[in-house]
Amino acid sequence: MCLKKFFLNTVSFINTDAIKTVLDIGCGPGHLVVKLLELEKDVTALDIAPNMLSITQARVDSMTFSSNFETILADYSAHEFDKTFDAISVMGFFDYVQDPVAVLQKLISDANKEIYISIPGDKGFLAWQRRVRYKQRNCPLYLYSRDSLVQHLQDAGCYEMTEIIDTERGFYIIIRK
């Protein structure tokens, strides 16, 4: 499952009347944000990179939406929200997470209903290639086996409410509260 498939699956799951507010963690250039605003969801876009939030904001500003939208420049792990969200989308984020259990526990507390997460797998040529590239850049990279993922979910106390879908590049996780 490539990122486009993750994106399409996440949009289809969120496209329900039960989901009204969405947090997009690591929103990048805002592709998912725009789609969710088109679906009339209230969206909070969080990213640690100011340039990504600028691109997202410009994209949103160029369109007309009736939904609420805000950006937050922050490290998700360190940010405290004054509200919870019906759904949280986490794509391309766990690659950089040193303590996945703490992040999973925070996600559970910040979500009212559902969480959609892409998790990078540790198998195959692409995983090997990423390891080499990130090592050359002296950048930490975290990849997961199915067993390590299950252990993290159990340690975070959310394994029983989790659906794990194996993909060619890793895993797509849905946590339903």
Predicted regions and their residues:
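Conserved alpha-helix/loop element of class I SAM-dependent methyltransferases that forms part
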Residues: 1-18
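Conserved class I S-adenosyl-L-methionine
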Residues: 19-26
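Class I SAM-dependent methyltransferase SAM/SAH-binding core
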Residues: 29-76
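A conserved beta-strand element that flanks and buttresses the S-adenosyl-L-methionine
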Residues: 89
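A short, conserved alpha-helix within the catalytic core of class I
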Residues: 97-106
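Conserved beta-strand signature within the Rossmann-like core of class I S-adenosyl-L-methionine
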Residues: 112-120
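Short, glycine-/aromatic-enriched active-site segment of Class I SAM-dependent methyltransferases
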Residues: 121-140
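Short alpha-helix
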Residues: 140-157
